[in-house]
């Protein structure tokens, strides 16, 4: 299965639980930066929040990156960020969850799934400014092509558990507070940077990158 198919299945899963309506990504629908072509789509997930996907290809097809972001403003889930990168024979899987809970929720089912799959090769991401709000249920793996099928299966099950968790059933009591918590992460990315953030800031400048992040990728601003 290609990584694009994995992300498509994730979108379909969201759509079954929280019907998706595509929104216009405007000037960001198709962009180029640092030798990469990006295709970006944004959705409103009914009863869930903002969903965005980004597909990037470059370097004569030698690199492919898929990103799926969920800012769950209407359910008390953590902010969800999925990245999958195929490059130079390596397959990297990163799922990051950020604490945007209005009230602490139980997502221990994800930690149990991580533990069941601890044999999959880990990837040390080092230390970052956002570590204090990144949840322990986050995942970072890196392997070769022979690991791709296992990564696919792990991701599908992890995402299923995420959207079927008890937290996914909790309707947010205060959307404003929820959005403020998500904004802490988004504004932190813009201020402190990150791999993708830095690429966009260098290519488009800070104001345009801020617009992409706030209005499209994370939907913290309408």
What are these regions (language model features)?
Residues 1-75, 79:
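Short Lys/Arg-enriched alpha/beta "domain-start" segment
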Residues 196-222:
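A cross-kingdom marker for long, charged
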Residues 29, 170-173, 215, 219-222:
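A sequence-level detector of short, solvent-exposed, charge-rich linear segments
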Residues 60-120:
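Aromatic- and glycine-enriched beta-alpha-beta binding-site module
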Residues 14, 18, 162, 166-169, ...:
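Short, flexible helical or helix-coil boundary motifs
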Residues 94-197, 201:
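Mixed-charge (acidic/basic) macromolecular-recognition segments
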Residues 1, 180, 221-222:
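Polar low-complexity intrinsically disordered regions
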Residues 24, 44, 49, 88, ...:
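A generic structural signal for solvent-exposed, polar alpha-helical segments
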